[in-house]
């Protein structure tokens, strides 16, 4: 886990509840839920869980921020579709398909709304050339066990990373700065704004970590 601080979170556009600065969050435990609008798992599990945490711990000092990002499907994971979801409950693409399949939409819309601040990660054009050094750096950032792999396994990973970078036209600043593995991801900061946890997928230990941070003095 890196040594980034709360101030390293980049929000390009606030869609709901912002702008919020790191100074305004001083003394609070901050949980940043990183998602994509075209990410079924984000809407099936992570965001509903975040709503529960917000309702349970808001008065005890927990602040949750929803941060939409885009590391793929750039035509779907857009600011416009984020605004649509937040303002009307409309979802798109694979998210719509999955939630429809599980009967989790009402009249084609979300049955819930996010009760906390929501913003969009800064997504910019990828201009850095794909060099061997960049491929290796990515491999080590996104796969911490890379150096422990066999030579054959390392070459397979490098090949996959190189192919990914070759077709990657955009980069999301917060997503890459914190070396997130995908969405949903959770980034937890303590009351001092120091990074306490970065997790990918469903996080079973999340509530206990939040409680530990809330119990600590600022």
Regions picked out by a protein language model, each given a short descriptive name:
Residues 20-46, 50, 63-67:
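Short active-site neighborhood of thiol/selenol oxidoreductases, capturing the structured segment around
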Residues 40, 73, 125-127, 195, ...:
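Flexible, glycine-rich phosphate/dinucleotide-binding loops
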Residues 1-23, 155-163:
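N-terminal "domain-start" segment that seeds a small globular fold
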Residues 4, 60, 114, 178-181:
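Structured loop/turn residues at beta-strand edges in well-structured enzyme cores
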Residues 137-218:
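Thiol-/selenol-based redox modules, centered on thioredoxin-like
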Residues 45-138:
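Structural microenvironment flanking redox-active thiols in thiol-disulfide oxidoreductases
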Residues 15-17, 122, 192:
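Solvent-exposed strand-loop boundary residues in beta-sheet-rich modules
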Residues 7, 29-30, 183-185:
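Short loop/turn microsegments at loop-to-beta-strand junctions
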